[in-house]
Every structure is written in C-alpha cells, then in structure tokens.
Swiss-Prot record:
Required for the first step of histidine biosynthesis. May allow the feedback regulation of ATP phosphoribosyltransferase activity by histidine. InterPro entries: aa-tRNA-synth_II/BPL/LPL, HisRS-like_core, HisRS/HisZ, HisZ. PANTHER family: HISTIDINE--TRNA LIGASE (PTHR11476:SF7), HISTIDYL-TRNA SYNTHETASE (PTHR11476). Keywords: Amino-acid biosynthesis, Cytoplasm, Histidine biosynthesis. This function is generally fulfilled by the C-terminal part of HisG, which is missing in some bacteria such as this one. GO terms for biological process: L-histidine biosynthetic process. Heteromultimer composed of HisG and HisZ subunits. Belongs to the class-II aminoacyl-tRNA synthetase family. HisZ subfamily. CDD domains: HisRS-like_core (cd00773). The gene is hisZ. Pathway: Amino-acid biosynthesis; L-histidine biosynthesis; L-histidine from 5-phospho-alpha-D-ribose 1-diphosphate: step 1/9. This is ATP phosphoribosyltransferase regulatory subunit.
Length: 395
C-alpha cells in the first residue's frame, strides 16, 4: 500500500471524531440509564466468539454478515460479532441460569461483512434490551414501550411503527401441509406481494386455507386491518387465531399508552421469519429507507445452549439514533486552562478541581500551537495574591 493510501478505511467502516464521539457517548449513557430505571441490567459480551456459539439460532442472514477468523490457539473457527443478541441469549441461558424473568441490556460495536443496505455503515454501535423467561404479551408490550421511550428520550421525530406476527403465516402454512421448499417459495412471494404467484403456490391447498393464505398479502393498513383479519381468519386453526388475538392485545395496549403513535399492520410482512416466533415490530421515520429500531419475539433461542427460554427484545444503532434525534447532546467543550509549572500549590489546585469534576488542561513545557481556546477552555488558572484562582479568560 502506498504511503498516501495508509489513512484509508474500508468501505462502510468509519471512525467517530470529537465532538461527535462525545455526543454519542452522552446518548449511550442516557439510554442505558433509562434501561436501568426499567430494571434492565447491563451485560458486556466479547467482540469475538467461536462461530457455532455466535450464530446459534440466528439463521443464514447473520452467517453472511459475520467476519470469520481462525483461532491460533485452538484452531477453531471464530466470528467477529455482527449481532449481540445471540451472545446475550447465551449469557441468560448458560451463564446466569436464572429462574423467572431476566431483563438484560447491552451497548457495543458490531462488525458486518456486508452492509445492511446500500451506503450504510458496516460498523454500527448496537444497543438493545432483552426480556427472557416470560411468554406472555405483557413482556412484548414492555419491550416495545421501552423502545418507544428510548426514541422519545432521543427526540426522534415523526416515528411510526409496523407490527406483525409471524405465527399467523406459520400456523396457516403448517395447517396447509406445505413442504419446506414450498413454504419458502410462498414466503418469498408473500414478501413481494406477488398475488398471481401466491395463488399458483396455494392451488393444491385446501380451499379455505388457500383463501386465508392469499388474503394475508392484502391484509395491511391501519387498525381496521386487524378487524378485517378477524373476519377473514375466523375459521383458521387455533394457533393462527391465538397469534392474531395476541397481536390485537399488543396493539390495543400500545394505542392506550401512545395514542399519537401511528401504527401500521402488514400480516404478509414476515420480517425475521426464520428467526422470530411471534410478534415482530419495527420503527420507521420519513426519509430513511430502513427501520431505525426493530425487534420481536424469538422463543427458545437458548435451546442451543441447553436451556430454551422465551425471549423478546429490540435493538437499534446508536449512531443512527444520535443522527436522527433532536435531543440536546451538548458536545461543546469547556474547561480551565492551567499554565505549565512545577509549583506544588498549582498541582494541588489542579488536582482539587479535577476531583470536583472540572476539566483542567495544563500547558506543556515549551509547547507550540496549543492555547486555551484550541484546548476548549473558557477559564484559566492565575496566580493572584499567592493563590491559584480560577478566572475568566482575558478577552
């Protein structure tokens, strides 16, 4: 590599400089404090793990996103984490092994071999919360509410939420007796809302079930969508109607708690179908082509670690949250400029001010170029009546 190119970073990999780094760190602390007030405990997971652990229960998409390396000590394949969620599931299932609900949260950098979308970062800062050990809709409502509180704290404007439930499609597909290949082809057609293809793929299915499957792709819109789904799926198998009623309970509670939040329902949108097992949700804002926060239920994710547990949670990219949010994250520097010197009294005053929480920058011996202004200081230490005193900078 030529010397002139040594500063280049790979596509989608960026560094965060001051003052933006200070804004992101302020936001991280505020959000983690919010999670703590809701009872969520912070966990810190490693950047690299053995691949089979890192990809447990996650499906092919995460495999394609994961950078892979060989551990020189064991010879086993390892992965650089592309998603923290499976790691937290391992912590809950294998390390903590708690009985009853467990609330965990996290914040850390992840690395993607492929970007989520064109011109997006491959090194987001993933932040999220997970609730393990409860299969009721109350836990889904809690994590969705926490996600919305996080967005409100960040002052992200004009949010709207998409809600769905993969159990509705899964229940119909199983009742129809579709093979794995046929179910996958139908799933692909559902995502494209290819009505002719959906009709062709369900031509050999029992007519009432075929009609329900074909209707799913058209069941999208506002709250009226759920009323229409109740009519269309009235004779559906029990797992389907139970999934629909769970979705309705969640939607009703969210409407009560957040009456101004626009809710959109698409029963044919199967985001995370191979990973999630119940409700799925995502938050969007105008002008951004992908969700800014997303999550859902993924029961039994801990099975690969020897302890299956119901689970629900959400995640977001902290850098995206900060860039979209309007919250005041003051990154302007202030501080006290201290002159260079070996005076013990000066050192004691500097130490005292730092212990009190002040930012103090001391000049270096013979330095050139740095001044109180370039160091971000708005005050200075001056010797006055043989005492080191904080004073405004001379104008």
């Amino acid at each position: 590599m030529a010397t002139v190119d040594r500063w280049l970073l790979p596509d989608g990999i960026e560094e965060v400089l001051p003052p933006e780094a200070a804004r992101i760190e302020t936001a991280r602390r505020r959000v983690l404090d919010l999670f703590q007030r809701w009872g969520y405990e912070l966990v810190i997971t490693p950047h690299v793990e053995f691949l089979e652990s890192l990809l447990s229960g996650s499906g092919q998409d995460l495999d394609l996103k994961t950078f892979k390396v060989i551990d020189p000590l064991s010879g086993r394949q390892m992965g650089l984490r592309a998603d923290i969620t499976p790691q937290v599931a391992r912590v809950d299932a294998h390390t903590l092994r708690r009985e009853g609900p467990s609330r965990l949260c996290y914040a850390g950098s992840v690395l993607h071999a492929k970007p989520r979308a064109l011109a997006t970062s491959r090194s987001p800062i993933q932040l999220g919360a997970e609730l393990y050990g409860d299969s009721s809709t109350s836990s889904d409502i809690e994590v969705i509410s926490l996600m919305l509180e996080m967005l409100e704290l960040a002052m992200v404007p004009d949010v709207h939420m998409d809600l769905g439930h993969v159990g509705i499609y899964r229940g119909l597909a199983r009742a129809a007796g579709l093979s794995g290949e046929a179910e996958q082809r139908l799933f692909d057609a559902m995502q494209r809302k290819a009505m002719d293809e959906i009709a062709e793929l369900t031509a050999t299915v029992e007519p009432s079930l075929a009609a329900m499957l074909q209707a799913l792709a058209r069941l999208c819109g506002g709250r009226e969508t759920l009323d229409a789904a109740r009519r269309v799926l009235a004779e559906a198998p029990a797992p389907v109607t139970e999934a629909l009623e769970a979705l309705i309970r969640i939607a009703d509670q969210l409407a009560l708690r957040y009456p101004d939040l626009p809710l959109y329902f698409d029963l044919g949108e199967l985001r995370g179908y191979h990973y999630h097992t119940g409700v799925v949700f995502a938050v969007f804002v105008p002008g951004v082509g992908q969700s800014i926060a997303q999550g859902g239920r993924y029961d039994d994710i801990g099975a690969d670690f020897g302890r299956a547990r119901p689970a629900t949670g959400f995640s977001t990219d902290l850098k995206t949250l900060v860039s979209l949010g309007k919250a005041e994250l003051d990154s302007r520097l202030s501080g006290i400029w201290a002159p260079y010197g070996d005076d013990t009294a000066l050192w004691q005053q500097i130490s005292r001010l730092r212990r009190e929480g002040e930012r103090v920058v001391q000049a270096l011996d013979g330095q050139n170029g740095e001044t109180a202004a370039t160091a971000g200081c708005d005050r200075q230490l001056i010797l006055q009546d043989e005492t080191w005193t904080v004073a405004p900078l001379a104008s």
